[in-house]
Amino acid sequence: LNPTNNGLTSYSCRGKGSTLTVKPDFVHIGGLGYIDPEIGTGLYSVDNNSNITYNCGTSFSAPLVAKTMALVEKQIEGIVSRETLIALMVQNSHIPYAFDRPEYRTMLKELIGYGMPTSAHKILNGDEHSINLVFASRIKPKKEMVFEFMWPQCLIRNNKCYGDVKITLVSTPTIDYNYGDEMIRGNLNVTLSQTKDNGTSQYYLKPLYKDEAVREHGEYEWQLINENMKWQPIKVYHKEFKRGTTHYSPWKLRVSREDRDFNVVDNEGIPFTIIMTISDTSLEA
């Protein structure tokens, strides 16, 4: 990104990655692609002679992302799983202001990936208007896991749940390169729901960057891959309840697994981490 307005630099690459994965994963300041007479490239470093100089390139933006992840890992006591570290970074990345427009939504995952990570301090401390829930486990074939929880009381008004929810799922499925584009052999899905008065479930969540023109039901496999990130180890979902839900019954976070045909059965299961952030967008609760 440019240091002046966080827009794309002239040398920014555009995704997609292999197996249609989101690439780039993140973006960060890389310096202007030209020399400005006042600020140079806007990104400064120290050369071999200890002199301050200006540079640009992905070789400078990538270490800034890696530094943030390293600081997060260092400040957490004990061993942190790979899935949890990645989930923390993805969950706490934001869309730079220059890209926060409706007309850019369908292009963002190929331009900025999951966004620009915030600081390690903010990742670990959050803010006073949100709460983070972390679910980390392993899931075996043909199994599903259900986590029940209650919506924060401060966000329940008139028997309706308000607020904003963002969910990041990171897993490490089996990979077999002999299958080419189908190398990822396992897929995890996550749903967020409430049980209605008639006993049926009301499902929420929408994949990040999903094209609103794509229908919600009856999607073809290619649509599930492109829009719902099927067979992707990283999935991000978001939902804002501006008008509140229809009721405030207990919530269920459900994780399910599906495998490709002829997949090698793993006895330990696929490791995963889910981070769910519930926040008050009005900054009052």
Language-model features, listed with the residues they occupy:
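Catalytic-core environment of secreted peptidases
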Residues: 1-62, 79
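Residues within well-ordered beta-strands of beta-sheet-rich folds
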Residues: 27, 164-170, 252-254
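Short, small-residue alpha-helix embedded
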Residues: 61-76
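An often Trp-containing, charged/polar helix-loop segment at the C-terminal end
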Residues: 76-101
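Charged/polar, low-hydrophobicity segments characteristic of intrinsically disordered regions
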Residues: 96-116, 199-214
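Secreted peptidase-domain scaffold signal
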Residues: 105-196
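Extended, solvent-exposed segments with strong compositional bias
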Residues: 128, 134-135, 200-244
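C-terminal edge strands of extracellular/lumenal beta-sandwich accessory domains
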Residues: 183-198, 239-285
